[in-house]
Amino acid sequence: MKRMIALDGAQGEGGGQILRAALSLSMITGQPFTITSIRAGRAKPGLLRQHLTAVKAAAEICRATVEGAELGSQRLVFRPGAVRGGEYRFAIGSAGSCTLVLQTVLPALWFADGPSRVEVSGGTDNPSAPPADFIRRVLEPLLAKIGIHQQTTLLRHGFYPAGGGVVATEVSPVASFNTLQLGERGNIVQMRGEVLLAGVPRHVAEREIATLAGSFSLHEQNIHNLPRDQGPGNTVSLEVESENITERFFVVGEKRVSAEVVAAQLVKEVKRYLASPAAVGEYLADQLVLPMALAGAGEFTVAHPSCHLLTNIAVVERFLPVRFGLIETDGVTRVSIE
């Protein structure tokens, strides 16, 4: 019998990232875990619908036995079984992030006995989670370089707080892992601005694009009007394509916040990324830790290691026989497998 790993949910960023990472790693390694003080660092501690959906999805895919899987629970025991490929559908029942649920279960399906398709309904444009276009246009091309083949499709948008969106991913078992080397960003090839609107006047998007264009030379400016019943909602994105990597940044519009202020938040974030020679942005860095650890080698550079990144590394090192090294050099932090 494999030993039970004990995790403190209050460590590091103190949110749902510890739980999601532990679920992924438990499914992959077969190691059971107990986590206490779940989301202790949040205003509403314990499992929310999105986290509970991730737990139930993980349990279904690997036939796990679970204790504490209920709303508000701050303690969970997860004993995994064998991961099974197949077709799965999960509903969050709120505007909780579809992509964070997918992020939890897809790594285990890289080791399944056959191809899989996972469909999740809930929120797709959430201010605290990566949108589907980030997964599709930024993360998945990098995963393909590592040898991981999955394809995400956004079937319907669902903005916060209404939800109602649908995202699906098709994924195949991994034959072998390759090493990812992302030390240099390279020169910028082009930048693309994009605005999504649902039930929001078009002039909002035009003002947001104008704000982006006032700070950057945009090769493309796209405004997409979605059906009104998918809103109300508004998301502004800016994609930076460089020689070695494509990064994508986004901001979700809010009621009573002007278009100019929303877009200015995005401008600030992109300028912060471009001010450093690091290849990888803060949010992408979190998501490269697990696939890099599974490959057993690789490196990337990031401007500053976030609390999420350090938390992810700490959890990975509890489940896998790997050690990460973080070295500050030339104004960046180089993250690698030691």
Swiss-Prot record:
Task: Explain the purpose of this protein.
Answer: Catalyzes the conversion of 3'-phosphate to a 2',3'-cyclic phosphodiester at the end of RNA. The mechanism of action of the enzyme occurs in 3 steps: (A) adenylation of the enzyme by ATP; (B) transfer of adenylate to an RNA-N3'P to produce RNA-N3'PP5'A; (C) and attack of the adjacent 2'-hydroxyl on the 3'-phosphorus in the diester linkage to produce the cyclic end product. The biological role of this enzyme is unknown but it is likely to function in some aspects of cellular RNA processing.
GO CC terms: cytoplasm
Q: Which organism is it from?
A: Shigella boydii serotype 18 (strain CDC 3083-94 / BS512)
Any single GO BP term: RNA processing
Q: What is its main location?
A: cytoplasm
The record's similarity note reads: Belongs to the RNA 3'-terminal cyclase family. Type 1 subfamily.
- List locations, semicolon-separated: Cytoplasm
Reaction equation(s) it catalyzes: a 3'-end 3'-phospho-ribonucleotide-RNA + ATP = a 3'-end 2',3'-cyclophospho-ribonucleotide-RNA + AMP + diphosphate
The protein's superkingdom reads Bacteria
The EC number(s) this enzyme carries: 6.5.1.4
Q: What is this protein called?
A: RNA 3'-terminal phosphate cyclase
Q: Which residues form the active site?
A: 308
- Provide a Gene Ontology MF annotation, just one: ATP binding
> Is this entry keyworded Nucleotide-binding?
yes
Q: Where does ATP bind?
A: 103, 283-287
Q: Does the keyword ATP-binding apply?
A: yes
Q: Keywords on this record?
A: ATP-binding, Cytoplasm, Ligase, Nucleotide-binding
SUPFAM superfamilies given for it?
EPT/RTPC-like, RNA 3'-terminal phosphate cyclase, RPTC, insert domain
The gene behind this protein is rtcA
